[in-house]
Amino acid sequence: MAQPLDFLLVSICLFHSLFSFQVEDYYAPTIESLIRNPETEDGACVFPFLYRSEIFYDCVNFNLKHKWCSLNKTYQGYWKYCALSDYAPCAFPFWYRHMIYWDCTEDGEVFGKKWCSLTPNYNKDQVWKYCIE
């Protein structure tokens, strides 16, 4: 009884090692990739950027303690940790519902915190962030 189970476990491990692969840009940047891929383009964050087939308009954190951004329009392994000055700026003016806003607003926010759109048309893109007061 133990031999078939051992064979099954060994087969599963072998199958997994042969047919699984890692796509480098599928995973979040690691400290090793930061060392291997130094900052370029003066270390400026590029927004929006494409990562894992998704578009991001601000700094993100995937499996990392701190937020990071891509240094290319399409993530190519070049990235950096975000400082306060790196976060995406509000897009003023922006269109929300039937109004144009030139400043942060509390409209539509349940908790009464001011927010802004990260694109000129919130109705279409629906990407936003809370404003720093």
Curated annotation (Swiss-Prot):
Q: Per the UniProt entry, what species is this protein from, by scientific name?
A: Mus musculus (Mouse)
Q: What is this protein called?
A: Binder of sperm protein homolog 1
Q: Name one GO molecular function term.
A: heparin binding
**Pfam families for this protein:** fn2
Q: Where in the cell is it found?
A: Secreted
Q: Which residues cross the membrane?
A: none
| Carbohydrate attachment residues | 72
Signal recorded as keyword: yes
Do the record's keywords include ATP-binding? Answer: no
Give the InterPro entries listed for this entry.
FN_type2_dom, FN_type2_sf, Kringle-like, Seminal_plasma_PDC-109-like, SP_Capacitation_Regulator
Q: Where is the Fibronectin type-II domain?
A: 40-84, 85-133
GO CC terms on record? cell surface; extracellular space
Q: Which residues form the signal peptide?
A: 1-20
In the record, the note on similarity to other proteins reads:
Belongs to the seminal plasma protein family.
Question: Where does this chain mainly localize?
Answer: secreted
> What does this gene product do?
Binds sperm in vitro and promotes sperm capacitation. Specifically promotes capacitation induced by high density lipoproteins (HDLs). Also binds heparin, phospholipid liposomes, and weakly to gelatin. Does not bind chondroitin sulfate B.
Which UniProt keywords are present, listed alphabetically?
Answer: Disulfide bond, Fertilization, Glycoprotein, Repeat, Secreted, Signal
- Give tissue specificity per the record: Expressed only in the epididymis.
Cysteines engaged in disulfide bonds, as pairs: 45-69, 59-82, 90-116, 104-131
Instruction: List the taxonomic lineage.
Output: Eukaryota, Metazoa, Chordata, Craniata, Vertebrata
One example of a Gene Ontology biological process annotation = sperm capacitation
